């Protein structure tokens, strides 16, 4: 069956943190996945929920699939670019702060 995808690039959270939430909804039905994401307290849950809703809308509008039969066929979290920032420290030194980003790809199928 055809897989319908939605992608969110350069999400401002690390891939490790997003994967913690993504592993909970992999291969679940869409209704169950949305329920899990609704009750999660993590920022990544909000990001994944937006991408999942977009994938559901794509499946319904573009391919005419029935929402009740959909499940999360694939969810892929890749590392995005890393922004490097400087934090001043004592005695004229500086530490590097890494602002990590991630790419969230959600695929739904029948």
UniProtKB/Swiss-Prot annotation:
Highest taxon of the lineage: Bacteria
Keywords: Ribonucleoprotein, Ribosomal protein, RNA-binding, rRNA-binding
Disulfide bonds: none
GO CC terms in record: cytosolic large ribosomal subunit
GO biological process per UniProt: translation
Alphabetized InterPro entries for the sequence: Ribosomal_uL22 (IPR001063), Ribosomal_uL22_bac/chlpt-type (IPR005727), Ribosomal_uL22_bac/org-type (IPR047867), Ribosomal_uL22_CS (IPR018260), Ribosomal_uL22_sf (IPR036394)
The keyword Lyase belongs to this UniProt entry's keyword annotation: no
SUPFAM superfamilies: Ribosomal protein L22 (SSF54843)
Entry-linked PROSITE patterns: RIBOSOMAL_L22
Record keyword Ribosomal protein present: yes
Transmembrane domains' residue ranges: none
GO molecular function list: rRNA binding; structural constituent of ribosome
HAMAP family linked: Ribosomal_uL22_B (MF_01331_B)
Protein's job: This protein binds specifically to 23S rRNA; its binding is stimulated by other ribosomal proteins, e.g. L4, L17, and L20. It is important during the early stages of 50S assembly. It makes multiple contacts with different domains of the 23S rRNA in the assembled 50S subunit and ribosome. The globular domain of the protein is located near the polypeptide exit tunnel on the outside of the subunit, while an extended beta-hairpin is found that lines the wall of the exit tunnel in the center of the 70S ribosome.
Family: Belongs to the universal ribosomal protein uL22 family.
Assembly, per entry: Part of the 50S ribosomal subunit.
Entry protein name: Large ribosomal subunit protein uL22
Organism the protein comes from: Ruthia magnifica subsp. Calyptogena magnifica
Gene: rplV
């Amino acid at each position: 069956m055809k897989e319908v995808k939605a992608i969110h690039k350069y999400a401002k959270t690390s891939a490790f943190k997003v994967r913690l939430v993504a592993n909970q909804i992999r291969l679940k039905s869409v209704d169950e996945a949305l329920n899990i994401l609704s009750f999660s307290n993590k920022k990544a849950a909000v990001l994944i929920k937006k991408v999942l809703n977009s994938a559901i809308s794509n499946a319904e509008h573009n391919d005419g699939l029935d929402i009740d039969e959909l499940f999360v066929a694939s969810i892929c979290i890749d590392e995005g670019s890393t922004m490097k920032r400087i934090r001043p420290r004592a005695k004229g030194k500086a530490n590097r702060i890494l602002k990590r980003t991630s790419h969230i790809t959600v695929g739904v199928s029948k």
